[in-house]
A protein has these predicted regions:
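Transmembrane helices with small-residue packing motifs
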Residues: 3-5, 55-56
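C-terminal transmembrane bundle of multi-pass solute transporters/carriers
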Residues: 23, 30, 44, 56-191
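Juxtamembrane intracellular "pre-TM" segments in multi-pass secondary transporters
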Residues: 6-40
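Hydrophobic alpha-helical transmembrane segments of multi-pass membrane transport/permease proteins
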Residues: 40-47
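Symmetry-related core transmembrane helices of the 12-TM Major Facilitator Superfamily/SLC fold
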Residues: 1-3, 191
């Protein structure tokens, strides 16, 4: 790491308000259809598909009958899958197009989440949540890499700010929207 030379000087314009910077990010995103699709995709995915993260304690207790250490291991299975999914994008899937990986990971994520959402078997829940985590981070890594490779240095920070709002900012909003639905019809149908 000590031999790496990087230019950390600020890029873009300085002295702009945060709203102006957000506006510049939106303008840059709209200028490239791929960038716009990536931002919309991660936003919709985060809003609608990551509700299960907030519901894992409920699923563990009510559907699987586990708590304590078993719940910790369940969440660790998700995290381990996510870590392997991210690493796999730079290793064994590095030659596969990010577009194919994004599309494929959404289907794998949906199937694994469906299994996780309906199962009452811990033997099925652990591998399902592991695969869910892996597919989730294959998608996030593929989309993030695509985004960063397509935007220029002078607007990358502004566009990545939009990415963070879509990726991390909409997950709790999705949880708030899903909460009353889960109370009304149950966790499995919502997932």
């Amino acid at each position: 790491m000590a031999t790496v030379h990087a230019d950390f000087s600020p890029k873009g314009h300085s002295g702009e308000s945060p709203w102006q910077q957000i506006k510049e990010g939106v303008v840059a995103a709209k200028a490239d259809p791929v960038v716009l699709r990536v931002l919309v995709m991660i936003s919709v995915f985060s809003l609608c598909s990551l509700v299960f993260i907030y519901q894992m304690p409920l699923i563990a207790e009510e559907r699987l009958g586990i708590d304590g250490l078993a719940y910790t291991l369940l969440f660790a299975a998700f995290a381990f899958g996510a870590a392997l999914g991210a690493i796999s994008m730079g290793t064994m899937f590095s030659e596969v197009s990010r577009s194919r990986m994004s599309t494929g990971s959404i289907y794998v994520f949906a199937a694994a989440l469906a299994v996780f959402g309906v199962t009452t078997s811990t033997w099925l829940a652990f591998p399902a949540v592991f695969v869910t985590g892996g597919a989730y981070f294959v998608l996030v890594t593929a989309l993030s890499t695509t985004l960063q490779m397509r935007v220029s240095d002078d607007v990358r920070g502004r566009v990545m700010g939009l990415w963070m709002m879509g990726w991390a900012g909409l997950v709790p909003v999705g949880g708030l929207i899903a909460g009353p639905l889960i109370d009304a019809i149950g966790v499995a149908p919502v997932l």
